[in-house]
Amino acid sequence: MKVSVLITLAVLGVMFVWASAAELEERGSDQRDSPAWLKSMERIFQSEERECRKMFGGCSVDSDCCAHLGCKPTLKYCAWDGTFGK
């Protein structure tokens, strides 16, 4: 009884390792191609005209942020500038 359980666990372990290796091999080409894909997406998003940055969005100057938000100089994010209005 104990031997059959051990053999079953060993077979399941081998099958798991085999399936994992096959999956890694299958997914390997996708991982090599992904940096080029990400760079092309980055170029697309940088080329678009952007709206104002909302609360806690990254910024470099106050004009990047929406109304009533200002760019904090230390961490470069949009935060409330203390003004009220419509």
UniProtKB/Swiss-Prot annotation:
Residues that bear Phenylalanine amide: F84
A molecular function (GO) term: sodium channel regulator activity
Keywords assigned: Amidation, Disulfide bond, Ion channel impairing toxin, Knottin, Potassium channel impairing toxin, Secreted, Signal, Toxin, Voltage-gated potassium channel impairing toxin, Voltage-gated sodium channel impairing toxin
Single GO cellular component term: extracellular region
InterPro entries tied to this protein: Huwentoxin-1 (IPR011696)
Subcellular location: Secreted
Disulphides: C52-C66, C59-C71, C65-C78
Propeptide regions on this chain: 22-50
Tissue expression profile of the protein: Expressed by the venom gland.
Signal peptide: 1-21
Keyword Secreted belongs to the record: yes
Pfam families on file: Toxin_12
UniProt keyword Signal present: yes
Similarity field: Belongs to the neurotoxin 10 (Hwtx-1) family. 28 (Jztx-11) subfamily.
Note on domains (UniProt): The presence of a 'disulfide through disulfide knot' structurally defines this protein as a knottin.
Additional observations: Negative results: does not show effect on Kv1.1/KCNA1, Kv1.2/KCNA2, Kv1.3/KCNA3, Kv1.4/KCNA4, Kv3.1/KCNC1 (all expressed in oocytes), voltage-gated sodium channels (Nav1) (from DRG neurons), and in a range of voltage-gated calcium channels (expressed in rat DRG neurons). In addition, does not show significant toxic symptoms when injected into mice and into cockroaches.
Function: This toxin acts as a voltage-dependent gating-modifier. It inhibits the sodium conductance (IC(50)=124 nM) and slows the fast inactivation (EC(50)=1180 nM) of Nav1.5/SCN5A. It significantly shifts the activation to more depolarized voltages and decreases the deactivation of Nav1.5 currents upon extreme depolarization, but only slightly affects voltage-dependence of steady-state inactivation. In addition, this toxin causes an approximately five-fold decrease in the rate of recovery from inactivation and an approximately 1.9-fold reduction in the closed-state inactivation rate.
Protein name, per record: Kappa-theraphotoxin-Cg1a 6
Taxonomic classification: Eukaryota, Metazoa, Ecdysozoa, Arthropoda, Chelicerata
